[in-house]
């Protein structure tokens, strides 16, 4: 029996203030000023629920908790839902693609 495809990749816009974090800047040497800064993740939850959990500090990434502004569904909705393995691979692929476009990207 095939497993239900219920995993999601999601992208959260981060405030430009995240650029004051040295670790974020070091991980994004090809960042193009003016491009968005984002967090890319994957979850078995609805992306809206996962974003709310990040902001509430529940299993959250510090950059999302402190700098997260909103979800960017135009960058991920076409992919979802998918299997765990597909989501794991797609999360990496989306991060690489966005970095290649000059975005500042954080992935846990």
Stretches found by the model and what they are:
Residues 45-48, 52-108:
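Aromatic/basic micro-patches that form nucleic-acid/chromatin recognition or nuclease catalytic surfaces
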Residues 1-52, 84-94:
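GIY-YIG nuclease catalytic motif and its immediate N-terminal context
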């Amino acid at each position: 029996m095939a497993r239900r495809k219920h995993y999601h990749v999601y992208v959260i816009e981060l405030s430009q203030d995240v650029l004051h974090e040295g670790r974020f800047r070091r991980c994004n040497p090809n960042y193009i000023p003016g491009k968005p800064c984002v967090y890319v993740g994957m979850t078995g939850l609805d992306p809206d629920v996962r974003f709310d959990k990040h902001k509430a500090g529940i299993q959250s990434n510090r950059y999302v908790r402190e700098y997260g502004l909103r979800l960017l569904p135009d960058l991920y909705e076409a992919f979802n839902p998918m299997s765990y393995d597909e989501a794991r691979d797609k999360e990496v692929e989306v991060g690489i693609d966005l970095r290649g476009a000059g975005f500042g990207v954080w992935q846990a």
